[in-house]
Amino acid sequence: MILVLAEAALELVPESLWRHPAIVADARRRGKKPGEILLDRARHHVAMAKLDKAERRGRPDIVHQVLLAFQYSLLNRAGRGRAFVHTVGDYIISVKPETRVPKNYNNFVSLMEQLFKVGRVPPEGEALMEARRGSLAALLEELGGKWVALHEQGRAVSFAELGRAVADAVVVVGGFPHGDFENKWILEGAEAVYKIGNVSLDAAQAVCRAVAAAEAALGLI
């Protein structure tokens, strides 16, 4: 399975907020410049009040939860997984299978800030994660131009059928807290769209179940 977390709410604080008192105070506390810290709804709620599309931004915890679920899975450890993150600001983050994502959230935040600043982590030696400018469309084309999507409006299938469908596919999951894909072609151009259960699931919950289904289909569990 190649996981693509799309339109993820992961970005550095935009320049329009650099002078906001909440941003300045948080950056000073951490010994960084305002433009070097991640936008985080939990700490920057007041500053984000007038930010464009604020409801879809500032949730690095979603990316953290998804990568923890995926990178430490049996699927990934068996060499059958690869993860990519497409951010709201059109960055593409590639994550090597051997990458052990920090389990501590604060450490993860620091890692992402370094990644945006340097373009790779670690800064020297073999890169485990790399960030580059790029669109979601370009990434999916690089990955073969075919994908399936997980979405609450998709077709309900059995656990076994889901596993067979996603085990060797490019799987697109939304990485935002509210709303729907802004790129409507994600669902329109997908080979198939599946839903898991009868309620809307958080991204990490959807990924956990898709990964488990793939592991079962591949005989890993």
Swiss-Prot record:
Keywords, comma-separated and alphabetical: Methyltransferase, Ribosome biogenesis, RNA-binding, rRNA processing, rRNA-binding, S-adenosyl-L-methionine, Transferase
UniProt site positions, description: Interaction with substrate rRNA: R59, R100, K103, N107
Domain of life where this protein originates: Archaea
Catalytic activity annotation: a pseudouridine in rRNA + S-adenosyl-L-methionine = an N(1)-methylpseudouridine in rRNA + S-adenosyl-L-homocysteine + H(+)
The keyword Coiled coil is annotated on this UniProt entry: no
MF-aspect GO terms: rRNA (pseudouridine) methyltransferase activity; rRNA binding
KW Zinc (keyword) present: no
Coiled-coil annotated residue ranges, if any: none
GO terms under biological process: rRNA base methylation
Pfam families assigned to the protein according to its UniProt record, in alphabetical order: EMG1 (PF03587)
Positions marked as site (Stabilizes Arg-59): D61
EC number per UniProt: 2.1.1.-
Residues the entry annotates as binding S-adenosyl-L-methionine: G174, G179, I196, G197, N198, V199, S200, L201
Function summary: Methyltransferase involved in ribosomal biogenesis. Specifically catalyzes the N1-methylation of the pseudouridine corresponding to position 914 in M.jannaschii 16S rRNA.
Subunit structure: Homodimer.
Protein family: Belongs to the class IV-like SAM-binding methyltransferase superfamily. RNA methyltransferase NEP1 family.
The name this protein goes by in its record: Ribosomal RNA small subunit methyltransferase Nep1
UniProt organism field: Pyrobaculum calidifontis (strain DSM 21063 / JCM 11548 / VA1)
Gene from which this protein is expressed: nep1
